[in-house]
């Protein structure tokens, strides 16, 4: 009955005892107790009594013991850009083979039969322009490496200055010469086709082009969503050319230089934890934008530009061009993500997600007889506790939780990075699926040019797949060893 005694067999919503739950985000020398006030007791019919229940039991903040991962070798910036440029050259070469192939095995009485490609139909100025665009990252990496400061010997300094001058002069002269010829040969409408991909820079980068300072700004120095929104609104009134100039300057300085690795602060303040997560979230989004824009730009110039400027008398396999666009974009994305999201960076995101925690929305009717607290942003909430926020009930899912229950971005951050190997597993699945598709297409191909194309592209992906598998095996053993060691200590 309504006012009777609750039955002994009545099941309640899963909730850990508050006196046993502990959590931390700090170093080992910190401890704190955080009572939570304003708690309401709920009756069976869901009506509040209006009385404050006793505060949560005193909690000792025990530091999270993060796993120490080994240092994995990463390619230097120039070597990485050289490998990426080689993959793009291979894809561009096989595309030209598919466009300008000949029937060279025919007898001399049948035209044409002397070369495997119709070299006289190739526009070499367009080819030079495409190669320079694909080599933009490599050129910038070489120039940055040659511009390094420090105590260098005089012959070494002379060599670096000479190399930088030679690379810039050769690239600039070739680019200007090819552009002059293209302006004389093609219409303005056709040349606009070359500039179309650069229009992605503004919508992708202008809203976050100056939130990072190259190593000079701490992630905990007051970065928040309000500050970011104010900065975006301040930039909104600028004219298009100034935004374009600022975007290009920031993009080149960040994209072509060594990516500064953010730092992780094991702090006890929930507000500082949320600010650190906000900074890391913006940094991760910036890197993903770089991956997306660079991969789409490279795939566009490899797959579509040669087709657009081909002569009308030449047959073009449009299906193969679209397939090549997908292969190049996915391959470039995986290679860039492995370079911009190294294991140390993914481990950093995992630590921040472990400190942030997560909330899961629950049905209020299932927990009407369970103690529910009013969520406040000043406290760390233990696992299993129920809170009320924005007229909804949430259950704490993390070891302890400082995330905002209604913030979807916090939930996404925890979902992607609470497992340290999730990003690496996604990359392995993408690369493995692409290699499997290429092997299947290679077995089904009947034309000689498609066989050569698929084989060359396939070999260019093996190196990236090997590096991903190596990182997965090493990191998997490191994290599993740390988890087993923690379980043994608990038992």
From Swiss-Prot:
Glycosylated position list: 9, 20, 29, 45
Lineage top rank: taxon: Eukaryota
Residue intervals passing through the bilayer: 79-99, 115-135, 152-172, 185-205, 290-310, 322-342, 423-443, 449-469
Protein name as catalogued: Transmembrane protein 39B
Disruption phenotype: Homozygous knockout fish for tmem39b are viable and fertile and seem normal. However, adult males have a significantly lower standard length and body weigh.
Protein's organism: Danio rerio (Zebrafish)
GO cellular-component term (any): membrane
Protein's job: May protect the cells against DNA damage caused by exposure to the cold-warming stress and facilitates tissue damage repair during the recovery phase.
């Amino acid at each position: 009955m309504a006012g009777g005694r609750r039955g002994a067999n009545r099941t309640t919503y899963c909730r850990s005892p508050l006196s046993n739950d502990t959590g931390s985000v700090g170093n080992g020398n910190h401890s704190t107790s955080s009572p939570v006030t304003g708690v309401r007791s709920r009756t069976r019919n869901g009506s509040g009594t209006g009385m404050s229940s006793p505060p949560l039991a005193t909690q000792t903040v025990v530091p999270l013991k993060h796993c120490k991962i080994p240092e994995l070798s990463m390619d230097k910036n120039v070597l990485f850009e050289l490998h990426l440029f080689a993959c793009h050259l291979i894809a561009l070469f096989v595309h030209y083979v598919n466009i300008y192939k000949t029937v060279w095995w025919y007898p001399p009485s049948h035209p044409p039969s002397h070369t495997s490609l119709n070299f006289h139909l190739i526009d070499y100025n367009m080819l030079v322009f495409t190669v320079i665009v694909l080599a933009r990252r490599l050129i910038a990496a070489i120039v940055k490496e040659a511009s390094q400061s420090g105590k260098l010997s005089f012959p070494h300094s002379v060599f670096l200055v000479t190399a930088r001058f030679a690379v810039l002069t050769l690239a600039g002269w070739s680019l200007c010469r090819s552009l002059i010829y293209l302006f004389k040969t093609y219409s303005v409408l056709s040349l606009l086709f070359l500039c179309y991909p650069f229009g992605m820079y503004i919508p992708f980068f202008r809203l976050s082009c100056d939130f990072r300072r190259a190593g000079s700004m701490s992630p905990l120095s007051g970065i928040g969503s309000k500050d970011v929104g104010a900065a975006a609104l301040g930039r909104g009134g600028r004219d298009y050319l100034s935004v374009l100039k600022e975007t290009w300057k920031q993009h080149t300085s960040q994209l072509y230089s060594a990516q500064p690795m953010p730092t992780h602060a094991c702090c006890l303040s929930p507000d500082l934890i949320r600010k650190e997560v906000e900074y890391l979230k913006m940094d991760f989004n910036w890197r993903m934008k770089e991956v997306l824009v660079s991969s789409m730009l490279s795939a566009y110039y490899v797959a579509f530009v040669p087709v657009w400027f081909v002569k009308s008398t030449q047959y073009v396999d449009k299906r193969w061009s679209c397939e090549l666009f997908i292969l190049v974009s996915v391959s470039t994305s995986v290679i860039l993500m492995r370079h911009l999201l190294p294991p140390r960076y993914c481990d950093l995101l995992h630590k921040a997600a472990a400190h942030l925690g997560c909330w899961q929305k629950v049905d209020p009717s299932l927990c009407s007889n369970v103690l529910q607290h009013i969520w406040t942003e000043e406290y760390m909430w233990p696992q299993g506790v129920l809170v009320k926020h924005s007229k909804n009930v949430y259950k704490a899912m993390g070891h302890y939780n400082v995330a905002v229950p209604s913030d979807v971005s916090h939930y996404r951050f925890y979902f992607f990075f609470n497992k340290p190997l999730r990003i690496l597993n996604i990359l392995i699945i993408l690369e493995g699926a692409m290699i499997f598709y290429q092997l299947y297409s290679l077995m089904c191909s009947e034309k000689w040019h498609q066989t050569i194309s698929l084989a060359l592209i396939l070999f260019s992906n093996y190196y990236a797949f090997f590096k991903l598998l190596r990182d997965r095996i090493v990191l998997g053993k490191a994290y599993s060893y740390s988890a087993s060691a923690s379980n043994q200590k608990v038992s």
